[in-house]
Design a protein with these regions (language model features):
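Loop/turn segments within WD40 beta-propeller blades
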Residues: 117-118, 162-174, 225-232, 238, ...
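Beta-strand-rich domains and repeat architectures in extracellular enzymes and scaffolds
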Residues: 95-135, 150-178
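Short coil/turn segments within WD40 beta-propeller repeats
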Residues: 129-134, 183-187, 220-223, 241-245, ...
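A structural motif specific to WD40 beta-propellers
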Residues: 147-149, 197-200, 255-256, 296-299, ...
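WD40/WD-repeat beta-propeller blade N-cap
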Residues: 153-158, 203-222, 258-265, 272-273, ...
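Eukaryotic helix-linker segments that join adjacent hydrophobic helices
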Residues: 169-223, 235
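Terminal intrinsically disordered, low-complexity extensions flanking WD-repeat/beta-propeller proteins
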Residues: 1-121, 130, 349, 378-484
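Short loop/turn segments that connect beta-strands within beta-propeller blades
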Residues: 140, 192-194, 249-252, 292-295, ...
Length: 484
């Protein structure tokens, strides 16, 4: 088995130019290996795991013999397949040297360690056999380069990745990512550290009878994560346990829990401008909009199937998109009770739903049918189909837009030998012709009138309700050291 269940990008200029390397003595390394070995042993799957296992999305079998009409294979030739498991780490010699390293790093390898200001990082959750890895790739379009910078061993099958800059132990913005997996624990990793074997910190705790410890956080797999860019100490998590948790990263504990769901919550997204609104999509076929200040559902809409993804139209925040398990994409005006349009976009679950970072109307969808499609939704009344391709990546499990280039998207699938690509859509004549003259703009554009904003905020204010009632809508003024 070799699959890519999740991926995301890191903006240019965020990562440290020279990431620090963790230096461990042989004794320290052996102690960590012994401690981590049980965590990294694949658990026996029970009936509950099978029910919630998102790998069910990979049932499609897509042939890989298709001719690549646009020669997209060149974008991921360097990605390869990594077979890595902490149980197979080589033993170090007594002098601390690695027996697998026979010489000093050459200049080219040292240059590859340096992250340039025009480099993007690409975060890839990969599962190889019984092992799980977070791969940190460097992508530079100007230099036509895409290579693995470093990787991190993960304790469980990764289901979602979310980048964030909040480090509770540092007053400066960091470069971290939160990972949700088949366990109930969220791990937050420092991306500016190489060779790290432990996360920066964890969110959640499993019960321990010997220590008289009860659950903290979720009780089942974490299916999606959403970091709040306005209240940067807030992270939302959606779970197979039928709850959404809001975490206060300052103290590393849940501050609120929403339980209005009949099934697992598969997708969540914060409003681009109003940081207290959270959009959720559930397997019970309902899309819900929460006002997190009051822990209430402001509005809800019926979907045409189990909700796979929700997405705000950041170019016009009156609207959001929904994709479903039976292949539909729906477009919703949040001021209305029903969707504006529905299109049967794919034959299977639409797992990928992404808008361009700065080209209005450019929508990309991908699904378990192995097909990626491009649409134009600049006209809110109906979508225009522009282009499609049946890839050789297998069932498509994740899709992510480049935050700096409006036409670059990353896609991951479950084809054992070929499961990751970066697409430059300007290479496609139909897409280039449709969008090349369109004026680019920031994808955060609040077009609502003051009256419309007030209409969505008609709940009586309670200043003591949640973590959103702070003196500032950004980072708390003082951060305290905490146990990691």
């Amino acid at each position: 088995m070799s699959i890519i269940p999740c991926t995301t990008w890191v903006k240019k200029g965020v990562a440290s130019t020279n990431p620090a390397k963790i230096q461990l003595t042989p004794k320290e390394l052996n102690q960590i290996i012994k401690h981590k070995q049980p965590e990294l042993t694949p658990p026996v799957e029970n009936d509950s795991d099978k029910k919630h296992n998102k790998v069910k999305k990979q049932k499609s079998e897509v042939g890989s013999s298709e001719i690549d009409e646009y020669n997209f294979d060149k974008y991921d030739d360097e990605s390869g397949n990594i077979h890595c498991n902490i149980g197979n780490i080589a033993s170090f010699e007594e002098d601390g040297t690695d027996p697998l390293i026979t010489g000093e790093d050459d200049d080219s390898e040292k240059d590859d360690d340096i992250i340039k200001s025009n480099d993007n990082l690409v975060l890839i959750g990969r599962v190889e056999g019984g092992g799980s890895i977070l791969e940190v790739f460097v992508y530079n379009q100007d230099e036509d380069s895409f290579y693995c910078h470093h990787d991190i061993l993960l304790p469980s099958f990764p289901l979602c990745i979310e980048w964030l800059d909040f480090d509770p132990s540092d007053s400066k913005p960091g470069n971290l990512c939160a990972i949700g997996d088949m366990t109930s624990i969220i791990q937050v990793w420092d991306l500016d550290l190489m060779d790290s074997l432990e996360p920066a910190y964890k969110l959640g705790r499993k019960p321990n009878k010997k220590r008289s410890q009860s659950y903290i956080g979720h009780r089942d797999a974490v299916l999606d994560l959403a970091w709040n860019k306005h209240y940067t100490h807030v992270l939302a998590s959606a779970s197979a346990d039928h709850t959404v948790q809001l975490w206060d990263l300052e103290i590393g504990a849940p501050a609120n829990k929403f339980t209005s769901f009949e099934e697992e919550i598969q997708t969540i997204k914060w409003h681009p401008n109003e940081g207290h609104y959270l959009l959720t999509g559930c397997a019970d076929t309902l899309v819900r909009l929460f006002d997190c200040r009051y822990e209430t559902v402001v509005k809800s809409w019926d979907a045409l199937g189990e909700v796979e993804k929700v997405l705000w139209n950041s170019f016009d925040t009156n609207y959001c998109l929904v994709s479903t398990s039976n292949g539909y994409v729906q477009y919703i005006d949040i001021r209305k009770d029903k969707s504006i349009w529905n299109v049967h976009a794919h034959t299977k679950e639409v797992i990928g739903l992404s808008l361009s970072s700065s080209c209005p109307g450019l929508l990309v969808t991908s699904a378990n049918d192995g097909v990626i499609k491009v649409w134009d939704i600049i006209n809110n009344k109906e979508p225009w189909f522009i282009w499609e391709k049946k890839t050789n990546l297998g069932a498509l499990l994740c899709l992510a837009p480049n935050p700096d280039n409006p036409f670059v998207f990353a896609v991951g699938g479950d084809n054992k030998s070929h499961n990751y690509k970066i697409f430059d859509l300007l290479e496609i004549p139909e897409v280039r012709e449709r969008f090349r003259e369109r004026k680019l703009q920031s994808n955060i554009n609040d077009t609502r009138t003051q009256e419309e904003k007030e209409e969505m905020m008609d709940v009586t204010e309670d200043k003591n309700s949640t973590i959103f009632n702070l003196n500032t809508t950004n980072t708390p003024s003082k951060r305290t050291k905490r146990n990691k």
